[in-house]
Amino acid sequence: MTREISIEDFQSAEECADCHLQHYQEWETSFHAHAFSDNIFLNMWNDEKESRPTTGVNFCIQCHAPAAFVSGYDLDGVDHPDEFNLPKAITEGVSCDICHTMVNKSPSVHTQDHVAAVAKYHINPGEGIKYGSIQNPDTNSFHESAYLPLFNLSSSCLPCHNQS
């Protein structure tokens, strides 16, 4: 990724529902949709921020609010997303654009006791292309669609799902 990513580069999952209603409805009830709003996560995140003030904020949001992580959005001082007027790209947790703007497989460092893991994303939101596992996708007027073979591999989920 050579350009800086802005939080405004990410589309809300609600926009995707216009054409992909079934996928949106499946996502809406998933852990991904609630990755940043689940009370168990929020309690653990707040504990982590207290015990590790220098790494606690970013350590958790890299996977639970990846749009905030890659855009550098400052979540310092945020204890609960409902108490702040945060962009939907953050409150939606792991939404469509996080995965469907991935342009390359994204490995991640495994967590060790003395090192905070850093998720590595190779994404390009805002460019207007959505990637997926369908070869020769239909054209549409909303965004360009492209096939990437990495979407057929579970290893495309490695930025976050890296624990053995």
Where are the predicted features?
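Sequence context of c-type cytochrome heme-c attachment sites
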Residues: 1-92, 97-152, 158-162
